[in-house]
Amino acid sequence: MSKNVSRTVEQLAEPIVRELHLELVEVEYKKEGPNWYLRVFIDADRGVNLDDCEAVSEKLSEVLDEVDPIKEAYFLEVSSPGAERPLKKEADVKKAVGKGVYVTTYEPIDGQKAFEGVLVSFEDATLVIEGKNKTRTVTYTVPYAKVANARLSILL
């Protein structure tokens, strides 16, 4: 049920977010304790501020009240995905070239399923990540088809 709600809300939110010159990163609908939360994550190249979140929240609330795709009571939260935003689409990965990333895979590649470092390139559906293995620099080649999760990472 929550995946269907998320997909429906994505379809409703996308034109609103685009009209405000923002990007819809993710929609999450989940129960935490006794409450349901509808979380809408937005971003922009310039960053996201409180006014952006408020504008999306107000416009989306109007549409949700009209269409009423969610039967139970819920809390609507609109926010930035944060510094370690998820990389959900290929376009997100392309924009992350030159930045720190953390990637997990469905199956091991050279004996490991987690990779962290700088995304050097993303070409031909392959991520090239330059990371550290103790004291030496290592280059990992990860096929995009094997990526389970990817997000930006703050490298220290």
Swiss-Prot record:
Coiled coil: none
A biological process term (GO) from this entry: translation
Top-level division of the source organism's lineage: Bacteria
Annotated signal peptide: none
UniProt entry keywords in alphabetical sequence: Cytoplasm, Ribosome biogenesis
Compartments (UniProt record): Cytoplasm
A Pfam family: DUF150_C
GO cellular component, one term: cytosol
Stored Gene3D superfamilies: Ribosome maturation factor RimP, C-terminal domain, RimP-like superfamily, N-terminal
Recorded family membership: Belongs to the RimP family.
PANTHER family for the chain: RIBOSOME MATURATION FACTOR RIMP
Primary role: Required for maturation of 30S ribosomal subunits.
Protein name: Ribosome maturation factor RimP
Species assigned in the record: Shouchella clausii (strain KSM-K16)
Top-level taxonomy: Bacteria, Bacillati, Bacillota, Bacilli, Bacillales
